[in-house]
Structure formats: structure tokens, C-alpha cells
Amino acid sequence: MEYIYASLLLHAAKKEISEENIKNVLSAAGITVDEVRLKAVAAALKEVNIDEILKTATAMPVAAVAAPAGQQTQQAAEKKEEKKEEEKKGPSEEEIGGGLSSLFG
């Protein structure tokens, strides 16, 4: 990811995205540069319009909207569990104990 970040930084600074410039940015950040990755990223970004990609990336819907639905489902499940526990209770321990004490009179 740091290679992409370096490329975006160069793009924002209006600098050429080249192997040398990416390497300089990564080295300045104290990152050990992998020459294979460096060449792959530089070659992949040569014919890419980064401005266009950034526009489409910001236009994509965010998935965070789905999170509240999950909370509602969890809350509903918790309420069902509480109802089941209340239904299962039956007679209390005192009621059961009172019936047994009459046996030993």
C-alpha cells in the first residue's frame, strides 16, 4: 500500500510518478524499497488517469449505512432471548421448596 500512497502523494504534488520519485518518497519515509514492487507499480500507473480514478472512488456509496440495520437485528434477537428466558422460568424455587417441605411435615 505504501507504494500507492507514495504515488498519490506525488500526484497531489503535481510530480511525475516514476520509479525514481516513488523510491525517493519511500526512502524519505524510512521504508525499505522492494525493486520488483517499485517497477510493477510504476509500470501499472503509467497509463492510468489518477484524477478519474479519484473521482469515481469518491462517488461510490459508503457501506456504513448498513451498520444500523445490524444493530436493530441484534437488539431484536436480544429481546427474543429475554422473552424466552421469562417464559422458561416456570415456578420459582420457593414454590418448589414449599411443596417438598409438606412431605416431611
Swiss-Prot record:
Q: Which GO terms describe its molecular function?
A: structural constituent of ribosome
Keyword annotations for this protein? Ribonucleoprotein, Ribosomal protein
What Pfam families does the record point to?
Answer: Ribosomal_60s
One GO CC annotation, please?
A: ribosome
Q: Does the keyword Transmembrane apply?
A: no
Q: Using the record's annotations, give every residue carrying the modification Blocked amino end (Met).
A: 1
Q: Where is the composition biased (Low complexity)?
A: 65-76
Task: Please note every region of biased composition (Basic and acidic residues).
Answer: 77-92
* UniProt xrefs under Gene3D superfamilies: 1.10.10.1410
**Domain of life of the organism encoding this protein:** Archaea
InterPro entries recorded for this chain? P1/P2_N_sf (IPR038716), Ribosomal_P1/P2 (IPR027534), Ribosomal_P1_arc (IPR022295)
> How does this polypeptide assemble, per the annotation?
Part of the 50S ribosomal subunit. Homodimer, it forms part of the ribosomal stalk which helps the ribosome interact with GTP-bound translation factors. Forms a heptameric uL10/P0(P1)2(P1)2(P1)2 complex, where uL10/P0 forms an elongated spine to which the P1 dimers bind in a sequential fashion.
Kindly give the PANTHER family that the UniProt entry links to this protein.
Answer: 60S ACIDIC RIBOSOMAL PROTEIN P1, LARGE RIBOSOMAL SUBUNIT PROTEIN P1
Q: What is this protein for, i.e. what is its function?
A: Forms part of the ribosomal stalk, playing a central role in the interaction of the ribosome with GTP-bound translation factors.
Tell me its family.
Answer: Belongs to the eukaryotic ribosomal protein P1/P2 family.
Q: What is this protein called?
A: Large ribosomal subunit protein P1
* Originating species: Sulfolobus acidocaldarius (strain ATCC 33909 / DSM 639 / JCM 8929 / NBRC 15157 / NCIMB 11770)
